[in-house]
């Protein structure tokens, strides 16, 4: 699947991985609808992208993925702006291990991903008037392994893997032109890692040592894996693991 001329919807697009995903899509000729709750940061990114790629191929709308109404409005606005939808990246995520942040983490990381996936299917399934496409849900290596520093974060990321693979197995999904894949990066040099604190991480000092032990990947490097999941039509229900020490590796799974 070439992304040239395709329309992409990206959550958590203002900084870090989300920004890198938008950038690589734009570099390859896609049109991008950015969403984020951080409007100030998003406007800076938007101006940067519009200066580099043009004002007509990228836009932004403030959107909280934990809000059903805001997500519905953002998807509707994407179709109205660009005429359709081909690529959805459910990327928005936070850390949160203490009250009340852990519930917010579940709302954003998991519920936001589920809501974004349901809306993506609604807009992209060919039997519902869509033209097919691909969904990439952003999990983590913490979605495949235990993480003593962030058990709630770990739980949300495990759930994203299970949910995404399950929906990818629906016969109606692939039969109507939609693929769903999962990206599981290890530690990345983003604000989520640099801002580790007691409210969003347990045993912060040990966690920081662990995070830097094997080195941090750049968002641009992780974006290369993201683009692979978008463009490779043979990938559906695939889990791509990425790490500084082991590169890109597809996770072996069973369908049982």
Region locations from a protein language model:
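Conserved glycine-rich Rossmann-like NAD(P)H-binding loop of the short-chain dehydrogenase/reductase
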Residues: 28-44
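Active-site helix of classical SDR
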Residues: 117, 156
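C-terminal helical subdomain
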Residues: 182, 201-255
């Amino acid at each position: 699947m070439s992304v040239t001329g395709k329309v992409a919807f990206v959550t958590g697009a203002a900084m870090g991985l989300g920004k890198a995903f938008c950038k690589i899509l734009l570099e390859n000729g896609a049109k991008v609808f950015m969403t984020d709750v951080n409007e100030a940061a998003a406007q800076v990114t938007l101006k940067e992208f519009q200066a580099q790629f043009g004002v007509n191929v990228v836009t932004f709308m403030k959107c909280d993925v934990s809000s059903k109404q805001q997500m519905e409005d953002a998807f509707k606005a994407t179709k109205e702006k660009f005429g359709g939808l081909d690529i959805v990246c459910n990327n928005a995520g936070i850390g949160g291990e203490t009250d009340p942040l852990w519930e917010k983490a579940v709302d954003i990381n998991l519920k936001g991903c589920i809501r974004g996936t349901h809306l993506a299917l609604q807009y992209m399934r060919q039997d519902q008037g869509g033209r097919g496409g691909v969904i990439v849900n952003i999990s983590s290596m913490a979605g495949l392994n235990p993480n003593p520093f962030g058990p709630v974060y770990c739980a949300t990321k495990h759930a994203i893997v299970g949910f995404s693979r399950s929906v990818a197995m629906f016969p109606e999904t692939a039969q109507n032109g939609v693929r769903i894949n999962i990206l599981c990066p290890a530690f990345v040099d983003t604000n989520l890692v640099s801002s580790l604190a007691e409210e969003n991480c347990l045993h912060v000092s040990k966690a920081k040592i662990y995070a830097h032990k094997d080195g941090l990947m750049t968002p641009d490097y992780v974006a290369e894996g993201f683009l692979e999941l978008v463009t490779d039509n043979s990938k559906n229900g695939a889990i791509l693991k990425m790490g500084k020490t082991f590169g890109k590796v597809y996770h072996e799974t069973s369908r049982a």
